Amino acid sequence: MELVLKDAQSALEVSEATFGREFNEALVHQVVVAFGAGARQGSKAQKTRSEVRGGGAKPWRQKGTGRARAGTIRSPIWRSGGVTFAAKPQDHSQKVNKKMYRGAIQSILSELVRQERLIVVEKFSVEAPKTKELLSKLNGLELSDVLIVTSEVDENLFLAARNLYKVDVRDVQGIDPVSLIAFEKVLITADAVKALEEALA
């Protein structure tokens, strides 16, 4: 299959397996959920009644005071007491094998092509790290909410986009399923398309 280059009167021959695959919603959902789960810090920690400082002595005798019986001031029903089911640090990451991950990325790329949200250009760069220059180029392509994918990290492009809302710059190694679906359009260079094909082959 072919992808038309926006800035040139030509087309790029690409793999049907990478850019013409049927959309697998269940697979994409699973991989996106796993990606989000892996990003969780998982460091929340609370103390149980046995871990809270103090509470060794019985606050008052068992009988005769008229008050409810109590054995420790660190009971979960007391103020400053321990937490009944205390949260502990945990790993939220989910296992996703390489074949599934590649399949999800291919599925997303294919759907972007079908929805005409993937824009391919021969080259895309800025002379200097100037936001105004990048904004001018994006306006020329009628793009505002866009992920820019290049084959290698372009420092000028990265710095120019850093202060723009709904604009992000990634190299091929830096893309992930969430970033691909988070933006309205994906602008990708021809070199990045070839690099993606090799990575997903």
UniProtKB/Swiss-Prot annotation:
One of its GO terms (molecular function) is rRNA binding. One of its GO terms (biological process) is translation. Keywords: Ribonucleoprotein, Ribosomal protein, RNA-binding, rRNA-binding. InterPro entries: Ribosomal_uL4 (IPR002136), Ribosomal_uL4-like (IPR013005), Ribosomal_uL4_dom_sf (IPR023574). GO terms for cellular component: ribonucleoprotein complex; ribosome. Residues 43-66 are annotated as: Disordered. The keyword Phosphoprotein does not apply. Belongs to the universal ribosomal protein uL4 family. One of the primary rRNA binding proteins, this protein initially binds near the 5'-end of the 23S rRNA. It is important during the early stages of 50S assembly. It makes multiple contacts with different domains of the 23S rRNA in the assembled 50S subunit and ribosome. Part of the 50S ribosomal subunit. This is Large ribosomal subunit protein uL4.
